[in-house]
Regions:
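Flexible loop and strand-edge segments within Gram-negative outer membrane beta-barrel domains
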Residues: 1, 6-82, 91-98, 168-170, ...
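Outer-membrane beta-barrel proteins
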Residues: 1-31, 41-45, 81-98, 162-172, ...
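Small-side-chain secondary-structure face that scaffolds active or pore-lining regions
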Residues: 2-15, 41-48, 99-101, 111-217, ...
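Short loop/turn motifs that connect adjacent beta-strands in outer-membrane beta-barrel proteins
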Residues: 27, 109-119, 184-191, 257, ...
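Surface-exposed loop/turn segments flanking beta-strands in extracellular/periplasmic regions
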Residues: 50-81, 137-160, 203-233, 325-355, ...
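Extracytoplasmic gating/loop element in the C-terminal half of outer-membrane beta-barrel translocons
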Residues: 65-66, 70, 78, 269, ...
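Conserved small-residue
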Residues: 208, 324, 414, 433-527, ...
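Outer-membrane beta-barrel signature, preferentially recognizing the C-terminal barrel domain
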Residues: 228-247, 336-382, 411-434, 471-477, ...
Length: 696
């Protein structure tokens, strides 16, 4: 597998799986699952999201090579030549992951005490050992010097040979034990209950060494690097977290008609200070199978199943930065000199990076759900409907907005934030057959939206920019009203400095006669879709089978600001002085401009002009298969033999065309955002797969 013609990427995996199931006695069962895996990865020093950002942000006229074959400098005038960055010329990143998962489980039936009683316990042990080397090295890039008419090598600007050698180990050990009871009384009362205890502990440790100024890249070990203090560095980091959970559930049904369930959790986390570590989280649900009632019998030929359901539950979240109840300090490499002459010495010191909050505790989510499940005409049609509303409370946020930075305070996170989520989920299906032909369709539809109830905001924040009352990730940008057609229109309209015909017109939201960031507005829309849907079509006939899956979204927007390597869509239909007045009046884009970071402060700003409807319907997958007749395969000892061809991401119906409407923020290997422009995101891949399945 590769998506680059010449690249440094390579991946190998070796895996060993063992599953042992043993029935020791009539009442005792034991299982042991073992998974061992080694991953050997090799790539260049630049991750794929970064590479695609550079591919798509290179100036159109900046070819990677000169006509004589010499690699040229990138658009920054130094090193960013994406055609070289995919190779191992700038260096390599080689690492190995050794993964071991072990899960022994013991189940004991305790029917000799009372029927339906059992005990069960398991241990899940997950270990990962990783080590790797990242090597950076200088490489040849050239630029043409018009003065000397010679190609100048910029190798000296691409860095020195350096090595980062690291090793990491982390483990998660989980112990789980439960006592359960499952029994039916008089064929009408069904009870299923258990109480359980679980504890888990996570440990992480990494150690790294850095050296530079190697004489060559022949021997890349730490001892071969420079011994000058400025050319070397060592580092290490450890982390640990743990949880203890007591939980239980009681499920009861009467004649499979009246259903009730109660779940309780009592969870403790070391992420919180003593006195705030424990949280009690209950949940309740009720169900009524109305179709089992006698009064329902007249409609049973049409509605064979109808169940009403309702639930309420509370969940806790401790997935936060650990030890926020402790103050955090960092050691700086700078400080004050004390003494004079040869006796002067640099005294390094600590500085506060986080103030302790001893009251930090669980974030909570209270969720209410109402719905029904139904099937019609002996299962030919089925329908599931759920309405939900979730109130997230005690979300950790800081008061950094309402307390100005000049206060000098390093503020802690506090359990202050409030967000509401609500929506509906619908799943419907239809199936039928005629002779040897079977077919069916299943569709799902989800509408969900969120609204910030409370978020700390500066008092001076304009009402039209506030987060409160809007989605969490609502976009803030200028509202574009059109394109300036004449200098007279510019002079009579609030505008930024140096605005001219062909530039975008922005709304003066606060009415002060000037355009500043205070005029930007917060939208009730974002790249997160409010509507997600999909449907699957399937059918089979005499060994042939077909499965088609469509996926889509709606009520989402994508910001597609132009970048340096503007796609053709941004070029065609733009405002130009050479156009007729009618052409400019209907221009799709403002006049050509230099990107904001290179001088433009007007057209390149985030605005509704660059906002596009991100709704789409995608043919996500199609699979066609054929199963050979059993009469043929049984003669050669094969129980079932199927051939198939599968296609993924085959085509998409959308109005964007500029980029994939589903992409959002590109992220690097560590999950940090690289850009929020859909044009620069890693594209989806269309894949065609041929295969066969053989069962003996």
């Amino acid at each position: 597998d590769a998506i680059y013609r010449n690249s440094a990427q390579d991946y190998k995996q070796f895996q060993l799986v063992s599953n042992l199931d043993a029935k020791i006695s009539k009442s005792v069962r034991f299982s042991l699952d073992i998974l061992g895996r080694q991953e050997q990865r090799k790539r260049g020093i630049y991750s794929t999201p970064y590479l695609f950002t550079y591919f798509l942000s290179t100036f159109p006229g900046s070819a990677p090579y000169y006509p004589n074959g010499l690699p040229r400098v990138g658009y920054d005038g130094i090193t960013r030549n994406a055609a070289i960055m995919v190779t191992d010329l700038p260096g390599s990143n080689n690492y190995t992951n050794n993964i071991l998962n072990i899960k022994p489980l013991l189940h004991i039936d305790l029917d000799f005490i009372t029927e339906g009683l059992y005990a069960e316990g398991y241990a899940a042990i997950d270990y990962t050992f990783s080590d790797g080397k990242q090597i950076n090295q200088p490489y040849d890039l050239y630029y043409y010097d018009n003065a000397t008419q010679e190609y100048q090598n910029k190798r000296s600007d691409t860095g020195q040979i350096s090595l980062n050698d690291w090793a990491t180990r982390y483990s998660t050990i989980t112990l789980n034990g439960r006592i359960g009871y499952e029994r039916t009384f008089n064929d009408v009362h069904k009870v299923n209950a258990f109480v359980a205890y679980e504890q888990s502990k996570y440990n992480y440790h990494t150690l790294s060494g850095y050296r530079t100024n190697f004489l060559s890249n022949t021997l890349m070990d730490l001892f071969a690097g420079s011994d000058v203090p400025a050319d070397k560095d060592n580092g290490g980091y450890s982390d640990a977290t743990a949880r203890v959970n007591f939980f239980g559930r009681v499920n009861y049904s009467y004649k499979d008609k009246y259903l009730a369930e109660v779940t309780m959790r009592y969870d403790g986390s070391m992420n919180f200070a003593p006195g705030h570590r424990w949280g009690l989280f209950p949940s309740f649900s009720l169900g009524w199978v109305m179709s089992e009632e006698k009064f329902f019998e007249p409609v049973k030929p049409y509605v064979d199943f109808l169940k009403l359901k309702a639930s309420w539950g509370q969940m806790g979240n401790d997935n936060i930065s650990a030890y926020q109840y402790l103050s955090q300090y960092a050691f700086t490499g700078t400080g004050a000199y004390f003494g004079s002459g040869d006796g002067a010495a640099l005294n390094k010191g600590f500085y506060l990076t986080r103030t302790a909050n001893p009251l930090v505790t669980w974030e909570t989510a209270n969720t209410t759900n109402l719905g029904f499940s139904a099937s019609f005409l002996n299962g030919m049609f089925s329908l599931d409907f759920d309405w939900f509303k979730s109130k997230r409370r005690d979300i950790l946020i800081t008061r950094s907005a309402s307390i100005p930075t000049y206060s000098g305070l390093v503020l802690p996170a506090e359990n202050l934030g409030k967000v509401n989520n609500s929506g509906v989920e619908i799943v419907a299906s239809y199936r039928d057959r005629a002779g040897d032909f079977e077919w069916g369709i299943t569709g799902n539809f989800t509408y969900a939206e969120n609204k910030v109830v409370y978020m700390d905001e500066a008092v001076a924040t304009p009402e039209w920019q506030r987060t409160t009352g809007n989605p969490i990730d609502g976009l803030v940008l200028y509202k574009a009203l059109g394109i300036y057609q004449s200098q007279e229109q510019v002079d009579n309209t609030p505008h930024m400095d140096n605005a001219a015909p062909g530039d975008l017109i922005y709304q003066d939201t606060n009415g002060d006669g000037t355009i500043t960031w205070d005029d930007a507005i917060r939208l009730n829309e974002s790249a997160t879709p409010k509507i997600v849907y999909g449907f699957t079509l399937n059918g089979s006939w005499k060994g042939l089978d077909l499965n088609v899956f469509f996926q889509g979204q709606a009520k989402a927007v994508q910001l597609v600001q132009p970048t340096m390597n503007m796609v053709t869509d941004f070029y065609e239909g733009r405002w130009r002085t050479e156009n007729t007045p009618e052409e400019n009046l209907n221009a799709r884009w403002p006049k050509a401009f230099i990107k904001q970071t290179y001088g433009d402060t007007w057209n390149g700003s985030a605005s509704t002009w660059w906002l596009r409807n991100a709704a789409f319907l995608r043919l996500k997958s199609v699979e066609i298969g054929y199963t050979l007749p059993k009469a043929w395969t049984s003669k050669i000892g094969i129980q079932r033999w199927r051939f198939y061809v599968n296609g993924n991401n085959l085509f998409t119906f959308d109005k964007m065309k500029i980029c994939d409407p589903e992409v959002g923020t590109s992220k690097d290997d560590n999950g940090y955002a690289i850009n929020s422009n859909g044009i620069l995101a890693y594209p989806l891949q269309r894949m065609i797969t041929f295969g066969t399945n053989i069962t003996f």
